[in-house]
Amino acid sequence: MSAVITPAEFNDYKVADISLAAWGRRETIIAESEMPALMGLRRKYAAEQPLKGAKILGCIHMTIQTAVLIETLVALGAEVRWSSCNIFSTQDQAAAAIAAAGIAVYAWKGETEEEYEWCIEQTILKDGQPWDANMILDDGGDLTEIIHKKYPAMLDKIHGVTEETTTGVHRLLDMLAKGELKIPAINVNDSVTKSKNDNKYGCRHSLNDAIKRGTDHLLSGKQALVIGYGDVGKGSAQSLRQEGMIVKVTEVDPICAMQACMDGFELVSPFIDGENDGTEASIDKALLGKIDLIVTTTGNVNVCDSNMLKALKKRAVVCNIGHFDNEIDTAFMRKNWAWEEVKPQVHKIHRTGAGAFDAQNDDYLILLAEGRLVNLGNATGHPSRIMDGSFANQVLAQIFLFDQKYADLAPAKKAERLTVEVLPKKLDEEVALEMVRGFGGVVTKLTKTQADYIGVTVEGPFKPDAYRY
């Protein structure tokens, strides 16, 4: 293992450096002041202890903001065991602070793939045996999949999983369709206070930050291609426009494509007439030959494929802000081109062939975070105020599922409850209200007459489930 720890009385952890705990604690205290919804829930439910008896397996980016989430879950009665869902996203001072607080955590920045899986296994196991967990909190679906495939007996006691991100939700829905999902799931990703905050506004803040930290480039006046215009793509395009970049967007969904046009972005395709036949002949080389930066945002595979990578402008920056590293064909890059590490999570990819390279060669791409999440690999991710909404949703989702006690139901009832659903809108509004209060905002209350006129209660929820914010 590459991580080093300092032995102590509590040893159910593995982090990079336990001496970073004081630094992590100082940052956590600051983060708490920027997370009003999460801290509001901590105060609101402290006496009730709604998670007393909950034993939560967590796999989500081990950042300072996650430390606030973990300690909120613990404050509301839960026991937790934690790992990170990405090999580069851990903030080592955050992991150290959690370990120093006596909470089991296995995470450090720069894990290998083998170490990543080992860390997840260590949270599942306690004293060498499967822990008697009864809840899962996941980001991306790796933990959920491992439990289903390697430790299926644990599922008999687990009440459900709350999933943070688009990719993980897709995996859950796929498992449900195939009859493989054995526990109910809450789709946290599609809560309005998650998707509109984290996916859109968070990426607007953190994408340009990561690119500038990784490259020290001035972005203004350069051309960028954003692949995908969902919520993450929207925030990413805004992030680059803020820097003065000339931003183009490519999309497969006509509705998202229309939105890109309406928002003033040029809609293009890296493929001639939009058709990818898998050959270099289908590539719009004139377009890609002018692109200085390409960002993938889709959650799909090979959206920046080998033929596109060959056609990109010399010295173009390539990065991904989707969950996994397969959006960019990094496998092709590793097999066919030479990699030169400039600094951690920044590589020059020499397109002159594999093996030896000329350091003065100018035909290279700059790849950030090895094609993984750039905002967490090259920077510190979304700000605390953004993650406040996402993590408040996670807390409410954990309370909601734990209260349902799925594992204790009769088989017939279990069949009815085996679903992947979003949080009730009333809980989404609860998170939003706490966030508004954190900004010092004042929400106007409906009169009884007004509420009756539009067919809602004075307390809400205020919109139908089908409403698109």
Curated annotation (Swiss-Prot):
Documented EC number(s): 3.13.2.1
Subcellular location: Cytoplasm
Top-level EC class: hydrolase
Keyword Hydrolase: yes
The protein's annotated pathway: Amino-acid biosynthesis; L-homocysteine biosynthesis; L-homocysteine from S-adenosyl-L-homocysteine: step 1/1
Keywords noted in UniProt: Cytoplasm, Hydrolase, NAD, One-carbon metabolism
Free-text remark on how the cofactor is bound: Binds 1 NAD(+) per subunit.
Family from the record: Belongs to the adenosylhomocysteinase family.
Protein name: Adenosylhomocysteinase
Protein encoded by which gene: ahcY
